[in-house]
């Protein structure tokens, strides 16, 4: 007898079916009773069925023998075992992909779509999916194409569909032939073989009863299984949920079209074959769930007190609302955790919110979101082995393999294995540091590490670390030699069996399987069953894939295809999940079938774009293709547009979700996503909001501290409270940000009684101040020494942000060295080029203005060749791109040098010193300043290098100027100098002044200025609106701007003595504008006029004194242990812009204790007034 039971979505059909099956089992215990359900709910349904049997028996517990709760796949295996039928080896998706790639390559000339195009992995996957549909649908593509080509048939296909079918037919026939030859079974073969078995062996089910529930649609083969069971089984009962429990003629677009069509297909088959069947509509009891279901379908508008809509500030607020509600319901109303179900359209979006918050509130939960295998260490090992075979010495791949901890050398594990593993990981970190610092990649991994130490770029390069370096070299050789040997073996091997054996032996002999087993045992002993099964599942899948590969490709081994198959298979694989507890909250994805019996259901993430779940993923045969094929299908052979069916079923599926709760449904959405983008509610949410007349709860991230009414504030605060541990943060926030409240104080006191240590941590966190504390003078002396030896750039960093100075030069923290040709290294290359150029000219007693353009280039070529032989630059040249960059740099230095050569023909200043070092033990004395704060008992010594010093020996005096090379355009900024952020130019002038006798040989020495030399190849724009445009307003060419020559003029700080510049700059004899100095122009009276960067000799002397005061102040504060998080800010430039220590600072301008030190805009008069004031204080 066949029964079709129907009811509303809110009716307990699943419970009804389980009850009938249990009673049937008890009435006929010797016969098989089957409950067929979707795989996702098999476990929970089995628990419910056994529980129902126990209830009917009047027991608390029971066992069953012939009551089976199965999915379709498990049903197939059940009967295969019963019939002693062995199924062929199941074909993995990765193996199927490999077969299809081989077919397409072989058939390429015959194919239409793939003839001239590459079939990528995504397209292959679509083709395979369509092949499975064709196979399941029993469709004869060749016959279909013949019918479409027959003029007598009044049907036709468009060109796209015909071409796709043509290619699909060729590929499909070859695929089936290969699968048959290899004795494989495709993943849809289970149902096909099951149906063949049932058709040939009706005795297997003739005494059995079947109960089918929680399906709204069957695939073609599943439908055939139902038809066969209906024909041969002793009893067959179906349960379907329709709009109102009635069965009507299906019409596309109707609410329950899909399930009605399923019922129609079944009953039509029953009637056509004269099967006796009856329909039963169960009573639909009044309930809140039925009211909500009716309202959702537009059947009346009852009072929906069981529906709560929630608008949340964020996903965190959504997750906290779920946890707080569950906590309250369990703690105050006697609910159990298994009464709650949480659904999300994309559960992965909430993975980092829900799980931690539920754990914090000690709420047990089962997350049925499957974990992907592709991040497991074994999978990373396999994937990176493939990369190393493709590109030997791929540094990221090699380091990734080391970090998997699957190939640890034996010498680390002798003795204490845990300590040995820790030592191994430390050595891997140091080896990575060394490799990155020296640019070790590809074939360089074959070299001993000592070959790289000449560059001296990392501490391990120093002789004192030789033993450590030897240990790292031993580790390097271990991995490189083993992997290189494996690569050679696999690349040279042509026999698949031998190659796979070599690969498998490599894993086993190097301890990979043993490590996996050790991880499994450790996780099992700690009670983490989910973690314990992962190593075993990964290893078993690998074994299965190796077997598949040998079946698909037993002869001609291709290592690239082998690793491609492994990577593809693991990228799609998931770990099986284990329910953590029978009493736990269930977290699941919306759209998956769920068991009944939940009291409260949360549907989170109900934002526009998430609900409804419209599926528009590309398929090989599109919806349009399938529509044009529809006329060629019949009831026993067809292809379903599963995507269209899912889209048509969206409202029905949402109705199913609403009907899962017997008591209450919560639907929420966040107003922003994790990127802070605004989100709109789903159209479903808006529709329900109208049904409840706009009744909506607002879940905030935090209690509203702006609430003045104490009673209302207390009510809001209580809505955030759960366990003492989880509530402490909210209570601390309320205590700090609200007026004195006896309630808050009492709640804080109560929480402290349970979580005293946590309360202290939160109190400290609430009072946390990221500003550093000063250190003692004694500790400062231990860090810096009694006297301070420093450079100008170091002191500038102190004024930019003194905390950074402490981290860099006190604690000596450094970012990890990397072998990259960055802005600093390019600047060093420019400096080195000009330094050696000057030395070479002095060595040969050559004046640059006497050289021809060609001679200068030859000299530069000689200098560059010398530089690139240095160990550091040899290291950079290992990267071909760096070789290109050096050529670009050389063009820049050539332009600057040639410009300098031309200008020297009109300038009498001569480059005398390059990279002139000053300081202790140098020929040129540095600044040595006693510190008044320490009564002169301590001092600062300034050291450094001046890029270039130019001198002019005149009749009356010697003039000196310093040149500083810059890779970006610079000017002398008064505010930055006044604040100490830019000390360099004036401090270096002070050094020259202090060494006047050495520089001038006892003659009168005068400072001309300090200037920036912009090292650039930039040109001026043709159509710029700025003064740098090549054409003026009358479209006249500005010849002085051609070639960007104006950018190469010297700019900086000038001593305002016109006669001195006329003495050295020949151009000023003919015209008022200098060709050497930017911004230098004589007025009619022969002066310079008022300019902020021009200073008289007396003013310059004051600046020199002032810079000494700044240096003395910085040194005194450093040696006193003063530290502050005080970054400067000037416009868009800040002391944090290029900092390597931002993750330490945690600087946040929104915090009341964090603020920038804003530099004022200063004119020359303002600067001089400030200087005079400071000098008076110094006296």
UniProtKB/Swiss-Prot annotation:
Gene3D superfamilies: P-loop containing nucleotide triphosphate hydrolases (3.40.50.300)
GO biological process: double-strand break repair via homologous recombination
InterPro entries, sorted: ADDB_N, DNA_helicase_suRexB, P-loop_NTPase, PDDEXK_AddAB-type, Restrct_endonuc-II-like
UniProt keyword annotations, A-Z: ATP-binding, DNA damage, DNA repair, DNA-binding, Exonuclease, Helicase, Hydrolase, Nuclease, Nucleotide-binding
Assembly mode: Heterodimer of AddA and RexB.
Note: Despite having helicase-like domains, this subunit does not have helicase activity.
Protein name per its UniProtKB record: ATP-dependent helicase/deoxyribonuclease subunit B
Taxon lineage: Bacteria, Bacillati, Bacillota, Bacilli, Lactobacillales
